[in-house]
């Protein structure tokens, strides 16, 4: 191998290492989001607020409405209180450029009426799909979908 080839090979390996490091950092940043549900505390809430950009937005449908990070932190407290046995598991993560897709699972038993249904102690076990957009190492947007139709069926005993 000549000097040029050695230099090119070293540069390629160096760039690959940098890219892998950046991807690992992005995945860690995304995981910080989920800790507000899996390990709720003032520290995890503060960590999420730190990794989310000032104009972070969460979209759950095509209405054009979105939720801001402070509102999500407040709502997450209510979710965890209403479903104290909530188990949230990341089943898979995939990064493509500035986007990280997360496939996850939520299992919980609501403490009362939920989505117009009295679950009578029944739990739900559903899939969630989230797409996070990052810019300069910060979360900027989230698009998410949860399988609430399955949750409603499970809670109604059907």
Describe each model-derived feature in a short phrase.
Residues 1-9:
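Bacterial N-terminal signal peptides that target proteins for export
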Residues 18-24:
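Sec/Tat signal peptide C-region and signal peptidase I cleavage site
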Residues 108-135:
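Exposed beta-sheet edge and beta->alpha loop/turn motif
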Residues 46-97:
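A solvent-exposed, acidic/Ser-Thr-rich amphipathic alpha-helical stretch
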Residues 9-17:
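Bacterial N-terminal signal peptides
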Residues 98-110:
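A short hydrophobic beta-strand element
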Residues 24-55:
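Short acidic-aromatic low-complexity motifs
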Residues 125-153:
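Short beta-strand edge/turn micro-motifs at domain boundaries
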């Amino acid at each position: 191998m000549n000097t040029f080839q050695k230099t090119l090979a070293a540069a390629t390996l160096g760039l690959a290492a940098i890219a892998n490091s950046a991807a690992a950092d992005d995945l860690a940043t995304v995981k910080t989001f989920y800790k507000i549900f899996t390990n709720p505390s003032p520290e995890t809430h503060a960590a999420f607020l730190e990794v989310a950009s000032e104009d972070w937005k969460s979209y759950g449908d095509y209405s054009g409405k979105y939720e801001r990070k402070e509102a999500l932190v407040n709502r997450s407290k209510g979710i965890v209180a209403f479903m104290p046995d909530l188990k949230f598991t990341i089943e898979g993560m995939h990064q493509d450029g500035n986007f990280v897709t997360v496939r996850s699972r939520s299992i919980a038993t609501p403490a009362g009426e939920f989505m117009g249904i009295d679950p009578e102690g029944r739990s739900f076990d559903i899939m969630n799909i989230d797409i996070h957009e990052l810019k300069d190492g910060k979360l900027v947007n989230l698009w998410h979908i949860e399988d609430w139709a399955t949750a409603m069926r499970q809670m109604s005993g059907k």
